[in-house]
Amino acid sequence: MSSKKNRKRQKEGAEGASPSLSAAPSRSGTSTPFAQPSPAAPGMLVVTNFLEKVDGKVPKTFQNSLVHLGLNTMKSANICIGRPVLLTSLDGKQEVYTAWPVAGFPGGKVGLSEMAQKNVGVRAGETIQVQPLLGAVLQAQEMDLALSDKDKEINEEELTGCILRKLDGKIVLPGNFLYCTFYGRLCKLQVLQVKGTDGTTLGKLQSASGTDAQGMASEHSSMESSDVDLSFQLSQLDLKEPQSPSSQSTPCKPTNDRTVNKAGEVLLDVTQSPRDGSGLGLEESTGLKCSFDSSKEGNTQPVSEEKLLKPASAGTKSNTDTFYFISSTTRINLRKICTNSKEQDSQFKVTYDMIGGLNSQLKAIREIIELPLKQPELFKSYGIPAPRGLLLYGPPGTGKTMIARAVANEVGAYVSVINGPEIISKFYGETEARLRQIFAEATLRHPSIIFIDELDALCPKREGAQSEVEKRVVASLLTLMDGIGSEGSEGRVLVLGATNRPQALDAALRRPGRFDKEIEIGIPNAQDRLDILQKLLRRVPHLLTKAELLRLANNAHGYVGADLKALCNEAGLHALRRVLRKQPNLPDSKVAGMVKITLNDFLQGMNDIRPSAMREVAIDVPNVSWSDIGGLENIKLKLKQAVEWPLKHPKSFNRMGIQPPKGVLLYGPPGCSKTMIAKALANESGLNFLAIKGPELMNKYVGESERAVREIFRKARAVAPSIIFFDELDALAVERGSSSGAGNVADRVLAQLLTEMDGIEQLKNVTVLAATNRPDRIDKALMRPGRIDRIIYVPLPDAATRREILNLQFHSMPISNEVDLDELVLQTDTYSGAEIIAVCKEAALLALEENIKADCIMKRHFTQALSIVTPRIPESLRRFYEDYQEKSGLHTV
């Protein structure tokens, strides 16, 4: 049978049908096939891009394993539909794919997907050899795969099962890449060695020499050594490197560096000698090895990822050789690759020293976590059950995940990370099985910590669950946490959870015995922000003094740790732009030494980086200062007392035993600068400013208006210290019983507003500032002390205030010397501030109307403007405010 096959191969080689069987003259006078195809060999096709959506009948999962060919091309190459074909590039890289016909596909071309082009090492327009597989295709009994270090946390048993399921029937060669989606994560593996059911082993022998320029492992050729005598092999072995493919000569198969290993037989490896690269080296080790001196046992040496995860370029297989495919009975051996990133990992390893502003929380966390893990016997001796779980909760960006990473690095325990959304599977029972396996592995490798990030996504409240999967996951996690310690690992396994929505967690999860302790990681205060900034700038070149850092920390109201880190990055970019603007052509080495961050860089960065909680309610604070408002000095003082003093002098308030005012109401006639005062307060105080217009909160759906009020106060607490400004409060806080709307929406909104301002939940570092011109319509419950402590009447401007308002306007307008300021002050009696500004604008327009090129405003223009703009607040309204003030006894200024 073998003689017939040999005669057939010689006949095909004589006809030039197969490039891999083409004869070449050798030193011994025998003919041997080429190791690599020549560009002019038969079967060479031009690579083109894969055609998408050609055949809807082909499942999407199989499309990446196909190559597209024209019908005529398949006929001429004797390729059958749906049969495997061997792709061989000019560099010797090989892959096996399935041939698939495409109607109208151009002749002489082959369509490859992007992944196939990458694996074989070709691009569109290059040539590649396509041959049908004529040799036997047997099952692979065993296969060694290289697993990247980045996938080291993956469970090997489950990954092996996933590979056998998804790659069943895949024909593999040493050096090929395999891609497998594991729980939504794409894993890339490389075939190191394949052992068939016939005992033949195809493998890759790794070079341990660091001087290899390519840094790649050699592939071993496949040869039938069962019928070949060792002495015959040695007598025919050529120890000189062939000069060209045409002069290559060996008595074995042409692929010079693949190994064949049959059980109980001699191992023969042929590679280049590391000494001079001009010959072949021999080494004897329990048989005969021809390999590098340093590569004794390729599998016992840690192999770098750069050397493994590259396709082999040397050595090819003939299409008449024996090939092996993956089956359900194939045994998979996963070998992890050591990477060179250990130094980088240690450089960026998170430690306790890198966390700022959380000293008290870190102390409590270390007591809860480190003591049970390091001294479990101490708890047993006193009969104290060790805590099983610790829950960290707080707003996003405060450092919950960073604390967990620091704990994992500092404690030295085995850490298993569960990202809630990642392990959720659509298949029944798969999510619970994954959870059980993680807990079982942590128990075996104790002391260990199981960190569950975004716990609310994994364990929401069961009564509000969208599907049965969520309920089963919650029940499974409850059972697993109750079972911690049942195998004798009491106190040696701890679950650390993190969430920013603790109210969304299932109540059963938060009871003692599961998550025993809950620690809030809140928004940092000024002192904590200073600590965070100092640790962030520890390794950053800057010119900030301690006083400037303190000022920066005091101004960064509502910034969390993530915001401060983003602020430092933005300040660094500002500093870099400043240097490059002056000297744009500087080399990188000189720029690095010149860039130093200043306080001005941080102040500019704060204009771009706002607190995270303020981004959804971002408001451009108007550039209005106290100096832009004429007069009203007493009102300015009262507002500073209510807003700025509690922040700048908190010890004075504590010493006096008083609480800062919670609310300030400004009321008075329209146009008397009530809203402008609020703008100036927002700008001058530097606090986070939330401007709310009363009618915007009203919603026709039941409960939505109250929810909007509740959400406003929640955001204000999150970015405290902050100011909530309610303009036109009379539209929102209407006196109860006066509303005629359906469902009494106004009454419910008012009740929610009263509860938020002075309810069970304390309103800390949040000041409510309101403005209205109808104080008589506001409910009396809102006007009492404890809710609105300061009620300030803003009357029409007096003579001194009108003088300041006119002076401010004259600074920006060209006024003629004939204009008498005192006379204007007298003429604008009973005018509001807005009407005085309107008089000035009208006079300017009259001057332009008279002469478009006018360069100043004359007295006659003001006289005419005063006749056009008249006081619009009647005497009755002024008397109303005065009577209301006297009857209600409200505090006035």
UniProtKB/Swiss-Prot annotation:
ATP 2 binds at residues 668-675. Its main location: cytoplasm. It is found in: Cytoplasm; Mitochondrion; Cytoplasm, Cytoskeleton, Spindle. InterPro entries: AAA+_ATPase, AAA_ATPase_domain, AAA_lid_3, Asp_de-COase-like_dom_sf, ATPase_AAA_core, ATPase_AAA_CS, P-loop_NTPase. GO terms for biological process: brain development; cell differentiation; ribosomal large subunit biogenesis; spermatogenesis. Pfam families: AAA, AAA_lid_3. It is an enzyme of class 3 (hydrolase). PANTHER family: AAA-FAMILY ATPASE, ATPASE FAMILY GENE 2 PROTEIN HOMOLOG A. The first ATP-binding region binds ATP with low affinity whereas the second ATP-binding region binds ATP with high affinity. This is ATPase family gene 2 protein homolog A. The lineage of its organism: Eukaryota, Metazoa, Chordata, Craniata, Vertebrata. The gene is Afg2a.
